[in-house]
Design a protein with these regions (language model features):
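ABC-type nucleotide-binding domain
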Residues: 2-196
Length: 196
C-alpha cells in the first residue's frame, strides 16, 4: 500500500521491548491503546526513559511492535510500503542535523520544489523567520557543517520548518523544542494549533 489517506493514528494493545546484546529484553511499552484523530495536536508526557520516543518511533516503523497493532489512516503500518509511509511521517528529534549550504537549501531538503514563499511561511510557523531576517544574508545565509554557526534552539526551529515543508500527514516533534525558551515554545505550539 502506498497511499496514506490521512494522519489518524491508533495504537491497539501495543507492546514493545528492546533486546540487548545478551538477548535480555527490557519491556518499554505494555498494552498501549490510543487513538489520535487526523489534524489533532497532542502531547505525550512522561519522565526520561518512560517510552515516549519508542512509542512515536513505532509510527514510521523505525521499530516494529512486539504485540498489538499500530495503524495509520486505519491500516496497519506494516501494510504500507515503507518509503511511502516514511514520506508521510515527518519526525523532528531533539538532536537535529543541518547540512552545509544556505538556509534556503537546507529547507529544500524537506521539499525540493518549495517556493520561497512556502519556505518563509514554514519558518514563520516554526518561529525561525525572525532570527533568519537578522542575518545579513537572510535566507541565503550559509550554514556551517552541522549547523555550527546557529544556536541549538535556532537549529531545532530550522529543522521543524524543514519538516513542515514536507507537508506530511503526521508531524512528530520528539523533544524537538528542548533548546528553545518557554515563550518561543508556546508560540510554536500556538501556530500549530492555528495551522491544524
Amino acid at each position: 500500500m502506498t497511499e496514506v489517506a490521512d494522519g489518524s493514528i491508533s495504537f491497539d494493545h501495543v507492546d514493545f521491548s528492546y533486546t540487548d546484546e545478551n538477548g535480555d529484553k527490557t519491556h518499554v511499552l505494555k498494552d498501549i491503546t490510543l487513538d489520535i484523530k487526523s489534524g489533532e495536536v497532542i502531547g505525550i508526557l512522561g519522565g526520561t526513559g518512560s517510552g515516549k520516543s519508542s512509542l512515536v518511533q513505532l509510527i514510521p516503523r523505525l521499530y516494529d511492535v512486539e504485540a498489538g497493532h499500530v495503524k495509520v489512516a486505519g491500516h496497519d503500518v506494516k501494510d504500507y510500503d515503507l518509503d511511502s509511509l516514511r514520506k508521510q511521517v515527518a519526525m523532528v528529534l531533539q538532536t537535529n542535523v543541518l547540512f552545509s549550504g544556505t538556509i534556503k537549501e537546507n529547507m529544500r531538503w524537506g521539499n525540493k520544489q518549495a517556493t520561497d514563499e512556502e519556505i518563509i511561511e514554514a519558518c514563520k510557523i516554526a518561529q525561525a523567520d525572525e532570527f533568519i531576517q537578522e542575518f545579513k544574508d537572510g535566507y541565503d545565509t550559509k550554514i556551517e557543517r552541522g549547523g555550527a554557526n546557529v544556536s541549538g534552539g535556532q537549529r531545532q526551529r530550522l529543522c521543524i520548518a524543514r519538516a513542515l515543508l514536507m507537508n506530511p500527514k503526521i508531524l512528530i516533534l520528539d523533544d524537538s523544542t528542548s533548546a528553545v525558551d518557554t515563550k518561543t515554545d508556546s508560540l510554536i505550539a500556538s501556530r500549530f494549533r492555528i495551522k491544524s
